[in-house]
Amino acid sequence: LFHAAEAEKLKNFIEKQETDEQALLVSAVMLNIQRYFDPQKYRLLLHFCRTEHTKVRARAMTAAVWTYMQYEKRFVYYPDLSDGLSLLAQDERLKGELILLQQQFLLSLETAKAERKLQNEIFPDLLRSRNYQRNKMGFEQMEEDLAKALRGEPNAEWEKMRGNKQLADNMKEIIAMGKEGIDINLGTFSALKGFSFFQSVAHWFTPFNRRRPEVKSIFPPGIRHNPIQMLMEAGNFCESDKYSLCMMLNQIAPSQRDMMISQIGSQIEGNEEGLRDVAKESMNIGSVYRSYLQDLYRFFKLHPRKTQFDDPFKRDQLFTRYTVLESMLKTPAYLREMASFLMKRECYQDAIAYMEEALKHETANAEMLQKVAFCYQHTDRPSKAIYYYQQADLLSPNNEWILKQMYLCYSALGRYGQELDCLKSLEEMNPGDTRLISEIGLCLMQLGRYEEAAQRFYELEYNGERVVP
């Protein structure tokens, strides 16, 4: 354990370094404190949470939060550490970054889902497509289209291709995931972590620097617009993946490498302005946190000696599970924002906790009540869902969407009388709707009112329609 004087020396030493070295040293402190809890080192992390260097601050904030999650019970004996962590939320900038960090923690848990989507659906669909012809250079068109997709540029031709709608839908989903901040590059780069460069733990956390001897041959001096540099600046690459890309290029014969770089250059020619705009976006604070979390995910999931480290991604990442973290951000606005975020992720049970907490602090509105009800409905609790839908209906009467959800809940509970009431209200709003007529007929059958049901089905038959299952 450090004494205060030793911690002060380490702090002074770190502050004298360049920004990239500071960032690397803060990551080293995080790994150290993961292995052996040290209150002095935690105070050091809290200090760097307030630095003006964005890259350093993001690493210190991540380390401070994860360390608290790991050692929450010990913090009872160090009230100054809990207070120091709580005080971060008094700074509006840091409070915003804590929210970013919470969201990025949760997005990181979807990495495996994105990887399965690529490996099990998109790649096989591409390989089966007759529109991609193999030649001596490989699946050129496939690689170009996939690269566009991963950059967020959908190919309009996909939807025109016969039988390719599922492929287009899958690609759009992956594009949307990437835009939300979900890591869609893990599968591509996981095979590129076997280079000797990554045998050093430090290299998994080293900020990318094109002047490093291991990669400088990829960036020869005198080239004003290096295509690889432009690609790295504009792409959603974390620091570790940038090194992987350079290591891979270093393995290629110089003549082939030059040809590949030339091809990349020709593809981005004319799009320099757009790439510069994307590069500016990649420098914002959200991108800094996203990039670092991706570096961490790769280290804890792919490092050859990963079992020797405590994997923070295996812990519960929701701040509401931890006393101090919950108290730091417990405002109605934050609770609503996180509830909506969790709903988009289909984490309905956790979204309920956030929304019900928000309802304790502010007057309910129809939108919030609808969201709570929807979450209960999707966690197989239709009775609770109906309770909130009924309240929402009082605030927003004759709402077609609410009535649709209510009839589904009543149907799930076998309460066919109330289901019929909802269906008839919907029919008044949508006279002649085939599906509604069919649903009403089926509901009447459940109630044993067969003659009325038959009249509904005759109505469909008369109009040349059939019962919609």
Predicted feature residues:
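Alpha-solenoid helical-repeat scaffolds
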Residues: 202-396
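Conserved structural position within tetratricopeptide repeats
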Residues: 357-360, 390-394, 424-428, 458-462
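Primarily a tetratricopeptide repeat
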Residues: 40-43, 47, 353, 387, ...
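Non-catalytic protein-protein interaction scaffold segments in large eukaryotic complex-forming proteins
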Residues: 96-99, 107-266
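Start-of-helix register in tetratricopeptide repeats
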Residues: 59, 333, 367, 400-401, ...
